[in-house]
C-alpha cells in the first residue's frame, strides 16, 4: 500500500485490490504504512507536515508503529470536508474511500487513529506510554528559559512552528528529586497560606497527579507517603549515632558468622520508621542480604572500630595480672602476645581471602569439615559466655563497694551473690532484643563511662606515684608462683578477634587493613603495658583484682567512677552475650523455626535466652571469689584456641592447597604447637591453684 493517498471526490472504483490488507493488519489504509493523509483536494495540510516528525514514535497499529500524527476530527468535520461518495476506487496509485458507504474494515482501521475528544490523548494506541514521555520532555527543556510545551503532549494536527531544540540528557536526570522538592515546597507554602486541608487536620497531597504520572513518579509518591505516615523528617544521623550503630551491627556478624534473624527485619520495618524515611527514589527496591551494609567504612573509621573492639574491661584486670607475673615478665609477655596475635590475625584474614568465605566457622568447615566448624563456634560461644560472667562479677564487686561506702552499710551486709543475680533482672529484657542496633544507646553510654574510668585510672595512678613514690619494695620482676595466671589474663585482654572479619569486610579499601591493624596493635600494646605497669608501680603487691578498689573510697570522684564503670559493664554485658546466644540458638532450634509468624517458637526462643542468662549468672557466682583465676581460665581455655590454634591451622591447610613456601608452613606448625602447649599448661595450672 506504499505510495497511496486517502482522498475523496472521484466517485468510482479504479482498482481490484481495494479489499487487500497491509502487512500489519490495518486494512486498506495507507496511514499506518507511511503515506500522507490528505483532505478532499489531495493536498497535505501544513500542520500535518510539521507534526509528522513529532508523532512518528507515538503509537502503532498491529502491524507497526504509527508513522503519522493523529487527526483531531469529529464526525461533523469529516462529513463537511469530504464530498459524497458511494464507492472506493484506485487510480494511478490513489485509493478513494467512500465516506457515506465505506468498507467496514476501512472504518475500523481509521477509527483507531482518530481522537474523538481532543483533551484525551489516551484514546490513541500506546497513548498511556507516549503521554508521559511527551510530558517529561515538555517539563525538562535544555534550559529553564526555553519554551515550555503544555502539560499534555501536542497531539493535534498543528504544532508550534518554533519548537525549541533539546540536547541529549543523561538518564540520571529522570531520577532528579526536583519534582519532590518542588512539590514539598508548594505543599509547605500552601500550608503556610492557610491550606483548607491543613485547616481541618489533613495533610496536603505530597505530589500532584501529573507528577505521579511522570516516569518514576509512583515510587517517589510512595516514599513521600511513608515519610508523612510516620511524621519523620529523615535527619542525617550524627557522627556518634551512625558509628555506634555500625559498630553494633558488627556483632550481628561476629567472627563473620551471620547471627541475624528474620524477627530482626520485621522489627526494623514495624518499629523503626526512621529507617524507612532514609529511603530515596534511587534506593534499590530489593535490599541486599540482610545485615550487609552497602556503605563502606574509611580507613580511619576502621581504626576506631578496631580500637573499640580491643580496649574494654580487660585492661582493668592487668594491674593484678602484673603482680601475678612480675612487671618484667608481664611487659615482655604482653609485647610478645601482641606480635603473635597480629600474625595470627593476619593469617585469619589471608585464609578468608583464599577460601572465599566470610565466616570463621565456615572456613573450618570447608578446610577440615563440620567438626572443625563446631569446635570454632563452641570456642566463640564459650569465650563470650566467659566474658559475660567475668563482667557480671566485675559489676557486682564495684556495686557492692559503692553501696557500702555511699550508704554507709556494714561490709558484707549484702552478699556478692545478691548483686550478681540482681543483674539478671536487667540482662533478661536486653537479651530478648532481636535487633542489636537497639542496644546502641546502652553501648554508647557504656563506652563513654569506660573512657572516663580509664582517664581517672591514669590520672590518679600518676598522682599517687607523684605523692607516695613507686612501690619498688613489693614489686617483683618475675613471680615464680603465679606467672601462669598472667598468660590467661593477657589473652583475655585481646578479646577483639571476633570483630576482625566484619571490620575488614566493611572497609572501603581492604588493602589498608594490615597497616591499620598493625597500628592498632601498637596502640593497644602501649595502653595495656602502661596501665598495668603504672598501677602496679603505684600500689605494689597490694593491688586489687579490680584496680578501682585501690583508690580512696571516701572521695566523690572514686565513688562516681566506680558507679559509672559498673553501669558501663552492666550495659555492655548483653552485647557480649549476643553472639553466644545466637550460636547456641541456631544449634538448638531448626533452621526453619522462625518466631516471625509463630508466637510459640518465639516464646521458646525467649525462654532459651533467659536460661542462658541465668546460666551465665550461675557461672559468675561460682567464680566470684577468685575473679583473677576465673578470668585467667577463660583466657586460657577459650581464647587461646581462637587466636593461637585455629587461625594457623586454617592457614596451614589453605596454604598447602595454594602452594605456600615451606618456611611459612613451618611457622604455622610452630604457632599451633605453642598454642596447644600454652593452653594445656595454663589451664591446668589455673585449675590447680583455684582448687587449692
UniProtKB/Swiss-Prot annotation:
Record's GO cellular component terms: fungal-type vacuole; fungal-type vacuole membrane; vacuolar membrane
InterPro entries registered for this protein in UniProt: AA_transpt_TM
PTM annotation (Phosphoserine): residues: 59, 119, 121, 165
Annotated Acidic residues bias: 258-279
Sequence intervals crossing the membrane: 302-322, 329-349, 374-394, 412-432, 443-463, 483-503, 519-539, 561-581, 607-627, 630-650, 665-685
Membrane topology listed for this record: Multi-pass membrane protein
Compositional bias ranges of the Low complexity kind: 15-24, 141-153
Annotated region described as Disordered, given as residue ranges: 1-71, 135-170, 258-294
Cellular compartment(s): Vacuole membrane
Biased composition (Polar residues): 1-14, 28-38, 154-167
Pfam family, one: Aa_trans
Recorded GO MF terms: L-glutamine transmembrane transporter activity; L-isoleucine transmembrane transporter activity; L-tyrosine transmembrane transporter activity
Biological processes, Gene Ontology terms: amino acid transmembrane export from vacuole; amino acid transmembrane transport; proline transport
Keywords: Amino-acid transport, Membrane, Phosphoprotein, Transmembrane, Transmembrane helix, Transport, Vacuole
Family designation: Belongs to the amino acid/polyamine transporter 2 family.
Role noted for this protein: Involved in amino acid efflux from the vacuole to the cytoplasm. Capable of transporting large neutral amino acids including tyrosine, glutamine, asparagine, isoleucine and leucine.
Protein name: Vacuolar amino acid transporter 3
Encoding gene, per UniProt annotation: AVT3
